[in-house]
């Protein structure tokens, strides 16, 4: 491990000064960044989704853009458009998706067509406007926030769209102690500005180090076992895609790196399984009618899959 490992720890320290609590969510954002993926944050209004995401974006440095999604937004408001002049010439006006870190706020407040414009750019790393392809900056990370499904005026992401996010995190209500701290220190919190800790090149360097973390064949088999069990669960309507296994592989490496290890343990996989699979999971209508939840399916899967024990996981 190199001195680069100190950078994620410094980001966490700065986030703690700007956002009360939410330690698990902060760690999840870091894992997403290190793994080269995008993160979807879900929670009710006023629980710090935007505040946490904005502070994290500030700490990452580079070019930061925020998109406040609304029902009347067009795809061109996200990706950009060509501006034509009277003499026949044109120039491309970049949309807010052209950034190193994009905060997609209240993503499920806009129409599926506009959602797709963002999510396709996330998957491809480029946008095509009027037949011309424009490459997005590297690195490019999207942090999406959304209201809980079923809220008024929401457009739930499709399974394919949700699959573009590596991880899903919850932003729940603060504890009594956390809420007391928030209320008592609100002036300081609102004034706090998170200074950039890293930049685009440092993020790319960190990702290269994460890619060197060893993943034992036993860990790979454990990941595949989890996929096999959850696909066979009688409450699941659609088998989860192979992207789940890939996401779990990448996120587990990032978690191990964040903990100062150059190898993955089964506990890394177990700890991240819910965040990787939850937003990709679709239950049968009759299962939901019976009161079964995605949490139930995830819990049953973790209990059923055989965890490798007493083995050598180091490379």
What are these regions (language model features)?
Residues 3-44:
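Pre-Walker A (pre-P-loop) alpha-helix and adjacent loop at the N terminus of AAA/AAA+ ATPase modules
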Residues 85-88, 106-110, 114, 122-213, ...:
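Canonical AAA+ ATPase core
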Residues 43, 105-106, 117:
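Walker B catalytic acidic pair
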